[in-house]
A protein has these predicted regions:
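Short loop/turn segments at secondary-structure transitions that flank enzyme active sites
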Residues: 15, 116, 172, 197-199
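Conserved alpha/beta core surface patches that mediate binding of polyanionic ligands
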Residues: 26-33, 79-89, 193-202
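Solvent-exposed alpha-helices and their adjacent loops that cap or buttress functional pockets
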Residues: 2, 39-43, 58-61, 99-103, ...
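Short beta-alpha junctions and helix-cap segments that line functional grooves
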Residues: 177-180, 187-188, 202
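Phosphate-backbone binding interfaces of nucleic-acid-interacting proteins
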Residues: 1-82
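Glycine/proline-enriched, intrinsically flexible loops and inter-domain linkers
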Residues: 76-174, 181, 192
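Charge-biased, low-complexity intrinsically disordered regions
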Residues: 33-35, 41-43, 118-120, 129, ...
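Conserved phosphate/anionic-ligand binding catalytic regions in large, soluble enzymes, centered on
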Residues: 1, 54-71, 130-156, 195-202
C-alpha cells in the first residue's frame, strides 16, 4: 500500500515469551507508550519447571509449594484477599446430582464487571505458566487456580438459564471447550451445566 513498515505484530511464541502461537500478543489499552522496547515491557525472568510428586491437590499450586519450602525454614507470606465478600442469596439455583464427585461446590457472583484485557503482570504470569490470557474475568480465575490449586471457572449469568447443575456426563455427550475443540466426554467426567426446565447444557 506504499506505507513503510517499521515493525511486525507477533505471537507470544514468536517473541519467545510464551507457548501460544495462534494469535498476536496484545497489550492492555494504555499499558505501554508506543515504541517501548520489548525488553522493558517484558523483562527477562526465571521460570521454574517443577514436578510435584505427592498426590496432594493442595500441594500442586504456588501456595502449596511455598508451604513446602516454609517447612524447610523459608519465610512464608500468605496472600490476603483484597475483596471482602458478603453472604447473600444467589440469584439462581444450584443442584449437585453427584455429591460424591463434587462434595463441596462454592459459588459467588459479581455485577458491574467490565470485560477487558488483564494487567500486563498477570498476562506475563499466565504465559510463564503455559496458559493463554483471554480477558480479565477468565484470567483471574486461572491465576487464582494456579496460586491455590483450586479449579475455578467464570460463568456469564445471562447464559446459565435457571441455575447451575453439577452432574456426570451423559453417554456420547460432546462439549466445545474454550480453545474451540469439540470433545467427547466420558460418563465418569463431571459436568458443570446450566439448565432450563428438564434440559441441561454444558
Amino acid at each position: 500500500q506504499g506505507v513503510r513498515s517499521f515493525g511486525m505484530a507477533l505471537s507470544p511464541r514468536e517473541l519467545g515469551v510464551g507457548e501460544y502461537g495462534g494469535g498476536l500478543l496484545e497489550f492492555p489499552e494504555d499499558a505501554l507508550p508506543p515504541g517501548t522496547p520489548l525488553a522493558e515491557a517484558w523483562p527477562e525472568e526465571v521460570v521454574l519447571d517443577l514436578e510435584v510428586t505427592p498426590n496432594r491437590p493442595d500441594a500442586l499450586g504456588l501456595l502449596g509449594l511455598a508451604r513446602d519450602l516454609h517447612a524447610l525454614g523459608y519465610a512464608l507470606v500468605e496472600p490476603e484477599a483484597a475483596l471482602k465478600a458478603e453472604a447473600l442469596p444467589l440469584p439462581f439455583a444450584l443442584k449437585v446430582e453427584d455429591p460424591e464427585g463434587a462434595p463441596h461446590f462454592t459459588l459467588g457472583y459479581a455485577f458491574g464487571l467490565r470485560v477487558a484485557p488483564s494487567p500486563l503482570w498477570m498476562q506475563r504470569a499466565l504465559f510463564a505458566a503455559g496458559m493463554r490470557p483471554i480477558n480479565n474475568v477468565v484470567d483471574v480465575t486461572n491465576y487464582v487456580m494456579l496460586e491455590r490449586a483450586q479449579p475455578m471457572h467464570a460463568f456469564d449469568l445471562r447464559f446459565i438459564g435457571e441455575g447451575i447443575l453439577v452432574r456426570r456426563a451423559r453417554p456420547g455427550e460432546r462439549l466445545r471447550t474454550l480453545d474451540g475443540v469439540e470433545r467427547t466426554l466420558h460418563p465418569e467426567d463431571l459436568v458443570i451445566a446450566g439448565w432450563r426446565g428438564e434440559e441441561s447444557f454444558p
